[in-house]
Amino acid sequence: MKQLRLEPINKVQGTINIPGSKSISNRALLLATLAKGTTTLTNLLDSDDIRYMLASLKQLGVNYRLSNDNTVCELEGIGAPLNSEQAQTLFLGNAGTAMRPLCAALTLGHGEFTLTGEPRMEERPIGDLVDALRQLGANVTYLKNDGFPPLTINATGLDAGEVEIAGDLSSQFLTALLMVAPLATGDVNIKIKGELVSKPYIDITIALMAQFGVQVVNHSYERFEIKAGQGYVSPGKVLVEGDASSASYFLAAGAIKGGEVKVTGVGRMSIQGDVKFADVLEKMGADIEWGDDYIISRGSTLKAVDLDMNHIPDAAMTIATAALFATGTTHIRNIYNWRIKETDRLAAMATELRKVGAIVDEGHDYISITPPTKPHTADIDTYNDHRMAMCFSMLAFADCGITINDPDCTSKTFPDYFNQFAALAQ
């Protein structure tokens, strides 16, 4: 197994241009496919999850051209549902942002489509989405365990009507349903069962749909209306914002060991909810400055916080390791959906934080972290989870340094992360 040793870093300073957002990249690729016209996507994320989406689209007959660095994609929209005369099997790795939307999109046309992935994907739920698609006439069959991939879709189109979908596990289910609703046979009204998690990710979806010419009526995140007759039309160009979750590591670095760290590509004008991570750092005592397309974080003495972080589930992981440098016990609440991500992130985070000496209380949907007087070094397991690797890079700010096992798992969203991180060290 590959290991990466991070020696202690005394100070960070510099500017980082954040690579494109995973959430926006894969949504935009699918909408561009369904739209009339050619779309040029710039600042597209070059990572595993995006490559799985692109490979699947190519297999389904979508034409696109990528720049040499894979960050500009010119894609010819088909302006219609995806169809295939031959049965297709699509391998989607562990990319939830490809699996869930494609599962929905492939019900719209005609053909037989089997969706598979890595072993962890077979443990990541998709049942709430499939239940909703079945209410609109979709024919979806599970191949192993009910409610989980792999699955086969026998597509004949999607009916209009009322549909209920659970919102308490993952916002990706609703995102997938929203994106395909305009191509159903008539009006679609979506009712949310339970409390909708990660609402800012739904805002991203609705904003991107609007860019492609489709309006969604949002009734306080309890009901959504999508009128028939709205087809997707390419806006010509789409700039993919920097990934706000990826920005969190550099902003935290500035707060812990700044100096001053400026991240560009996200800012006040961002459509991503995870930019609110900077507000949490500010509550912890960091000095934060906002621009339209940048955020600056400056070092300060940090104190613990006790917050509901359901709205920033990915970036909240960075607070868990930043808490090691704050005075007091930090409580991160309402984060059950950590358990159904790339790994069970609540269990993984608790295990690895204890390795460096933290006192941790892991609950059903919360984690509480009391830092040790002095963190100690450890070999950190990353569970094939990119965010675990990036979060624990914060331990380079302790006097002992840290060793990251399987550091290349960051290729899921940020292949160049550790080089960029090292570039900030003074």
Curated annotation (Swiss-Prot):
Reaction equations catalysed: 3-phosphoshikimate + phosphoenolpyruvate = 5-O-(1-carboxyvinyl)-3-phosphoshikimate + phosphate
Gene Ontology MF terms: 3-phosphoshikimate 1-carboxyvinyltransferase activity
KW Amino-acid biosynthesis (keyword) present: yes
Pathway: Metabolic intermediate biosynthesis; chorismate biosynthesis; chorismate from D-erythrose 4-phosphate and phosphoenolpyruvate: step 6/7
Main localization (coarse): cytoplasm
Protein role: Catalyzes the transfer of the enolpyruvyl moiety of phosphoenolpyruvate (PEP) to the 5-hydroxyl of shikimate-3-phosphate (S3P) to produce enolpyruvyl shikimate-3-phosphate and inorganic phosphate.
HAMAP family: EPSP_synth
Family according to the record: Belongs to the EPSP synthase family.
Subunit annotation: Monomer.
Protein name as catalogued: 3-phosphoshikimate 1-carboxyvinyltransferase
